[in-house]
C-alpha cells in the first residue's frame, strides 16, 4: 500500500495453538478491530468473552468435510488479496458485499509434532494444513 501504514479494522484469526491468543484478541478488540475466526478458534474466543464473527457467517457457507474446508472461499481470500491501490479491485470487493481483511493471525496444524509422535498415517494426513498455508500466502502476496 503506497499511502503508508495500513489501519487494522478487520482481522482473521485461525490457529491450532492458542497460547496467548486471548491477550492478542483482547488487544485487537479493544482497538475496535472486528475479529473473524474459524470454528475452533471462534469457539475458544467466544468462551473467553470476546466478540467474534465466524468465517461461515462471512462466507454464507459452513465448514465442510470435517473441518478440512474452512477458509478456502472467495469471500475469505478476495478481502486479503485485492489490490488496495486499485479502485477497480476495491469496487469489485464492495460489489461482493465484502470488506478488507487487514490482518491475518495463523499458525499451522502441528504436523511435525504428530509425525514425530509416530501417530497413525490418517492422523498425519489430517494435520497437513491447506487453508492456513493459503491464508499466509495470500497475506504475503499483498504485503508491501
Regions found by a protein language model. Name each.
Residues 1-37, 41-58:
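N-terminal glycine-/serine-/threonine-rich phosphate-binding loop
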Residues 40-111:
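Glycine-rich nucleotide/cofactor/substrate-binding loop typically near the N-terminus or early
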Residues 17, 38-39, 84-86, 132:
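Helix N-cap/beta->alpha junction signal
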Residues 6-9, 98-144:
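Internal alpha/beta core interface subdomains
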Residues 11-14, 80-82, 124-126:
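Short, flexible loop segments at the rims of nucleotide/cofactor-binding pockets, characterized by
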Residues 1-2, 66-70, 90-96, 124-127, ...:
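A generic local secondary-structure boundary/capping motif
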Amino acid at each position: 500500500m503506497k499511502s503508508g501504514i495500513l489501519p487494522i479494522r478487520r482481522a482473521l484469526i485461525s490457529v491450532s495453538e492458542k497460547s496467548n491468543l486471548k491477550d492478542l484478541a483482547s488487544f485487537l478488540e479493544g482497538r475496535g478491530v472486528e475479529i473473524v475466526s474459524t470454528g475452533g478458534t471462534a469457539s475458544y474466543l467466544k468462551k473467553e468473552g470476546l466478540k467474534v464473527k465466524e468465517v461461515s457467517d462471512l462466507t454464507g457457507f459452513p465448514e465442510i468435510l470435517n473441518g478440512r474446508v474452512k477458509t478456502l472461499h472467495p469471500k475469505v481470500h478476495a478481502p486479503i488479496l485485492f489490490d488496495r491501490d486499485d479502485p477497480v479491485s476495491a469496487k469489485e470487493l464492495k460489489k461482493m458485499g465484502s470488506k478488507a481483511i487487514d490482518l491475518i493471525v495463523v499458525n499451522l496444524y502441528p504436523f511435525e509434532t504428530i509425525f514425530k509422535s509416530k501417530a497413525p498415517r490418517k492422523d498425519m494426513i489430517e494435520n497437513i494444513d491447506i487453508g492456513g498455508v493459503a491464508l499466509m500466502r495470500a497475506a504475503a502476496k499483498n504485503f508491501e
